[in-house]
UniProtKB/Swiss-Prot annotation:
SMART domains: Molybdop_Fe4S4. Component of the periplasmic nitrate reductase NapAB complex composed of NapA and NapB. Belongs to the prokaryotic molybdopterin-containing oxidoreductase family. NasA/NapA/NarB subfamily. It comes from Laribacter hongkongensis (strain HLHK9). GO terms for cellular component: membrane; nitrate reductase complex; periplasmic space. This is Periplasmic nitrate reductase. Its EC number is 1.9.6.1. Binds 1 [4Fe-4S] cluster. Binds 1 molybdenum-bis(molybdopterin guanine dinucleotide) (Mo-bis-MGD) cofactor per subunit.
Amino acid sequence: MTLTRRDFIKANAAAAAATAAAVNLPLVPSMAQAATTDPATAGADIKWDKAACRFCGTGCSVLVGTKGGRVVATQGDPDAPVNRGLNCIKGYFLSKIMYGEDRLTKPLLRMKNGKFDKNGEFTPVTWKQAFDVMEEKFKTAMKAGGPEAVAMFGSGQWTIWEGYAAAKFMKAGLRSNNLDPNARHCMASAVVGFMRTFNMDEPMGCYDDIEKADAFVLWGSNMAEMHPILWSRITDRRLTHPDCQVHVLSTYEHRSFELADNKLVFGPQTDLAILNYIANHIIQTGAVNKDFIQKYCAFMKGDTDIGYGLRPTHPKQKAAKNPDSGKMDPITFEQFAAFVKPYTLEYTARTSCVPAERLKRLAELYADPKKKVVSFWTMGFNQHTRGTWANNLVYNIHLLTGKISTPGCGPFSLTGQPSACGTAREVGTFAHRLPADLVVMNPEHRKIAENIWKLPEGTIPPKMGLHAVAMQRALKDSKLKVYWQQCNNNMQAGPNINEEMYPGWRNPETFIIVSDPYPTVSAMAADLILPTAMWVEKEGAYGNAERRTQFWRQQVNAPGEAKSDLWQVVEFSKRFKVEEVWPAELVAKKPEYRGKTLYDVLFANGQVNKYKLDDMARQHGTAYHNEEARHVGFYLQKGLFEEYAAFGRGHGHDLALFDTYHKARGLRWPVVDGKETLWRYREGFDPYVKKGEGVRFYGQKDGRARIIALPFEPAAEVPDREYNMWLCTGRVLEHWHTGSMTRRVPELYRAVPDAQVFMHPADAELRGLKRGQQVKVISRRGEITLTLETRGRNKPPQGLVFIPFFDEGRLVNKLTLDATCPLSKETDYKKCAVKVVRA
């Protein structure tokens, strides 16, 4: 066998990933992965096609091999610009995620004596029976409490059209803005940060920045494990360019520190002080790009002491001077300089516990006009009671130096889910959003949506709906009666399970529906479980962290009676007549809708249903099945996408025509005249920036980005004498989120079967604990028992423990506090107080 240099690199990367996970590759020996990259050599009886990876927000493309109606193999797509033929260890086992032994294939309803009972046993029912019960529960709840009595909790793992259909069904059909995605728990702070600074969501740069940068700074991001393919590109850049630097900031050491030139372990929440110190250093050393800020920036000061997103009755929430306030007032550059001046090197070193020389080295990197810097961050910034502020403050640094919107330079918010950008954010499945950065609170935005959707004026309610944490509180308080969860496992992933989540789900007054392929913690706590099609069992589309939209075709059928989330929403919409859910005065504005169902109005409206099945056959060939399209009799996905795309075209969110994406390995929006945009807001790269403008942040009416003065403020809950340690939660390389897919892959489960608690050896010795012992981790809200680990990949400093959240047998969110960023409503999973004792 002859190996090219490319094959050799790929094979070694695969072997490295497998070694890290302590598993064997699906093809043995390791070189076999390189040897079978070309599908033509893998056997004529296997059919291959492309798909976006099912896991993180990187957006890798994989080749999917099918045979006999099953996915039998997956491999990295050598034509994909994102991953260039590589997979991480999870990607190598994608072929197994759909075939767990406990896959759900029929709807299951809690029943006793032949009818629904909240305390009954799960019993198989037909889809008609399931929808009959759902219909009765929805209509009863809405008759008594109006549209605000029902809610839907979606996902950054929804396909683009699943999220879009759900948004239409809830916000236009049922007229309820109680729709939120699980991306509220991971990306909401990034969204609000973008909107406050630029008034336009998502990164201005792209992954091409990696090959052009002189330095990388990771803020609360363990890319080595959470975005390993991007990390491989950073590693290549660092090791092949001797002057390249990597700086890593975190509250504990992890695998990304192994490549770091500058390691900064800071005290929880003090990243805010570090960010302000860097801004102060830039100003004090004369490193401000004065021309840039004079032309392209405006200065603001934000309200402070804004609380912690806790219940209004909580003492810390009651004590806040400006609870939940995002108000900003204009200031001058001189006032901004005075604001950050107290954040000296000495003060910041003392506050953060980071050695002064390391802080100074980091600040000098940003201040050096010759160094091109990319800042990456994920949950360390976002899952933070001041997560929006943290996002704003890192933008301040890049704006002060002009290191933004240019190749190799820029702030880059990474996403954790495959379509947190493409579905949750761009489609607008948040409780306050509509597609393309429109919001329900703005009457002009509502009018745009109503016109595109052919709805009477006043259909979309103007009040923001309940966000993720508020939904759980409303269920517990019996204000929310029906809750439909799709494509996530919130009973495991949501915060404060014991006090806020489980009581609401098992409240006798609530009805909980969970659509899932497996019997997850969420499914087992529900009243009705709907079996769901997964990944390539349906036609899909995701949008990744670099604004890249990617499509795939349905390649196999779902098992049994499992149906996609899209099918479920569209089919259920047939159960509602317009008159049943709209007030009479609204129906009177569109009398032609009288007697029609929500399906007729939303999905058979002359736009969504205008693409015929023969059009699908021409595009894909008859070899490809499409369950949803065959069921409704038209090319549903194409109709939904083209209607949705109308929101963004001509407004800086331009998407290409639907058919283009099936031919490409994704395109980065805005796509204008068939050309994708790599760097936004910069003349010569962005078609929306006119000749002579240089830079224009066109999301803002004046074209100027906001540099915002915001202080360091403490966390919601800090260690004390009894609960004397910080708890930080997160992930590991081998598992994804709650492990509902990866723990069903035997190789990944064997590699890391259980969650452990990582602790500094000195902390263990102080408590009389030893590595390998069973210990209890206890917070004010609950306790769990785990094995103690004082070595290995994660190395917390004294005073902090780390626990991953993938293990349904050790629910770490029994411990966490439901504090949120008051602006983004995103949960802070990184900071609460615990104690650790022998079990």
